[in-house]
């Protein structure tokens, strides 16, 4: 008789607990920092820097394998990908900052 009661309590507890996802960890970077880097990467793109060279520049900025560097790689992939086709230096920064602030 105790086993069904335990199962019932477990189900009630699970149903009452809210499930939510945490935003992607930023490490020591703020959303302003993410936006500033997006603008910097977009400037590189507008200056004709190829993606491979931009990765080399990122390695010089952040030689360690950190959460910050992973985030910066994601930003660079967006900037040098299809999204970057319609961005300016300013809009890249503001878009990435807004996305960061909304937890994306």
Predicted regions and their residues:
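Cleavable N-terminal signal peptides
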Residues: 8-9, 19
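Bacterial N-terminal signal peptides that target proteins for export
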Residues: 1-8
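Hydrophobic alpha-helical segments
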Residues: 32, 40-41
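N-terminal signal peptide c-region/cleavage motif recognized by signal peptidases
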Residues: 14-18
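Compact alpha-helical subdomains of small soluble proteins
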Residues: 45, 49-104
């Amino acid at each position: 008789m105790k086993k069904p009661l335990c199962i019932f309590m477990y189900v009630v507890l699970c149903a009452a607990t809210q499930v939510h996802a945490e935003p992607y960890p930023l490490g020591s970077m703020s959303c302003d920092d993410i936006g500033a880097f997006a603008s910097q990467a977009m400037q590189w793109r507008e200056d004709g820097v190829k993606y491979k060279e931009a990765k080399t520049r990122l390695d010089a900025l952040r030689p360690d394998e950190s959460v910050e560097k992973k985030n910066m790689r994601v930003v660079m992939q967006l900037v040098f990908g299809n999204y970057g086709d319609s961005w300016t230096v300013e809009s890249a920064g503001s878009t990435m900052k807004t996305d960061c602030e909304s937890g994306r």
